[in-house]
């Protein structure tokens, strides 16, 4: 399985933590960003990396003063901390992401591109290196095509060539002074892998009741599972939560699935940081039959409107105060865009096409079944720290190539 997150911030000229960091801060940010995206994308897939967003905005925060600083701290949930304490926490997260781990790969990289001859505070550069290990490079943004090629190559190198063409020459001009880029790459194998020979073509029913044929993986095994009430008295008021761990047990994917007759949009307003914590603490390990789509989702998001919706507005205006970054008082944040890629398959990483002969049936159900054949919400989290690495929903699964057979009995 691959998860990739990439966030880029363009600044243009104009007029196990060492800190007592609130456990739910990143989860709160995740939910807030998710709510902004679902309001703007009524019937679309959603995929983003809240950790990537938090760290990239943390780099911008290092350069901010005044109201600009206050807005960023408040919107990211840092108000309860002493000024600057959040950077130690973000550094801890970044260090965790880049620590070599035998069971999975989780890498994070940060890069700062500065216009040739443009003065950036030495203190800012030191802090960016200290907290985020950012690469700092001088570049000529007036050579927009060459800059785009150079940055895209950097992105490809830090996402195992999974994210390509992230920026274009149109994103840069002679007026561009500073670009911050953050990339996160995760590759993990399921602790209990799906056997490719069990994958079959299956109908996925969308919220508008249309159907699409997708490859559906299957296995019966021990997973963390629970059933929860949405608070209604209706028959469909119970939804399922399935947590599937990756090798090493530290990282897991959590699937949240409403009953088929209940649209996902009915369940989404319930999602809160506290509820995510409740799911994690309440699911119990038990034998479960799992039917999970094999799919990919790739999405690019213009975060400018999202961040504005969270209350981060001044940094995008001519009144922005980024004087901790540069003595040039004419800087403001012009663009903020984010790209993420998700691939789910049998191994967790790339797997060969299936061509099995095993038939699967709902007959004689002995264990709970999780049949993910309609829209669902998901998140990938660190089970030890609770940090949400990726969050999203699948409304329209983009099927990967498969040579499986139909479920004749389903």
Curated annotation (Swiss-Prot):
It holds the Pfam family Serpin. GO terms for molecular function: serine-type endopeptidase inhibitor activity. Keywords: Cytoplasmic vesicle, Glycoprotein, Protease inhibitor, Secreted, Serine protease inhibitor, Signal. The record marks 362-363 as: Reactive bond. SMART domains: SERPIN. Glycans are attached at residues 157, 401. This is Neuroserpin.
